[in-house]
Amino acid sequence: MCPKGSSVKGSLLLLLLMSSRFLFKAVESLPICPSGAVNCQVSLSDLFDRAVMLSHYIHSPSSEMFNEFDERYAQGRGFITKAINSCHTSSLSTPEDKEQAQQIRHEDLLNLVLRVLRSWSEPLYHLVTEVRSMQEAPDTILLKAMEIEEQNKRLLEGMEKIVGQVHPGDRENEVYSVWSGLPSLQMADEDTRLFAFYNLLHCLRRDSHKIDNYLKLLKCRLIHDSNC
């Protein structure tokens, strides 16, 4: 391995990481309880502001990552026809559009958001691990996967705080959809492995878009009394 080439690649990854951190600086600046704080109170409005910004931040790079992977690895392979309705979260009954979401009680929609976010904790962890092992995987894809995993954790934490304020005392069972796709990400057969990545990124883009829409609807209902 060429030390100079490795140094350049490392510098590029560091630059991309710094750029990504800068882009989500606005989210970091919103009020949130510091680690270990006792009796820290953050308003429901501030919590929703942060959650909506995080969900948008997650959806945007999710779309970019899918598009980049599609262009680099999936052209001419017919993956899109196989990816339809094959997401691990399909077992969760999620509204497909705004009109359907408006028919759901806010309690149920809040819990649904929690379930979808929890369903992505494990696959996002393994996505980062497996992208690292891909030969010639672009640094941009790895960086986006790392950031999305981190922000999904933050969003889940924020949603738990929101549910705690909207329905204090209620504890929703940690229900989520189990992901069993790791063996496919590690397959020796290239087509099988690439489709597993493609499908996971396709589902991530889909679900992050849904979460983004659900949170905007919930914020409108609970913060602005549906006057938006």
From Swiss-Prot:
UniProt key word Transport = no
Which CDD domains has this protein been placed in? prolactin_like
Q: Which GO-annotated molecular functions does the record name?
A: hormone activity; prolactin receptor binding
SUPFAM superfamilies, from UniProt?
4-helical cytokines (SSF47266)
Domain of life of the native organism: Eukaryota
Q: List the disulfide bonds.
A: 33-40, 87-203, 220-228
Give the Phosphoserine positions (modified residues). Answer: 55, 63, 119
Q: Tell where it localizes.
A: Secreted
What the entry lists under Gene3D superfamilies is as follows: 1.20.1250.10
Which InterPro entries does its entry note?
4_helix_cytokine-like_core, Somatotropin/Prolactin, Somatotropin_CS
Q: Which UniProt keywords apply?
A: Disulfide bond, Hormone, Lactation, Phosphoprotein, Secreted, Signal
| Transit peptide found in the keyword field | no
Q: Which GO terms describe its biological process?
A: cell surface receptor signaling pathway; female pregnancy; lactation; mammary gland development; positive regulation of lactation; positive regulation of receptor signaling pathway via JAK-STAT; response to nutrient levels
Signal peptide (residue range): 1-29
Record-level GO cellular component terms: extracellular space
Q: Its function?
A: Prolactin acts primarily on the mammary gland by promoting lactation.
Describe, as the record does, how this protein assembles with itself and its partners.
Interacts with PRLR.
Protein name stated in the entry: Prolactin
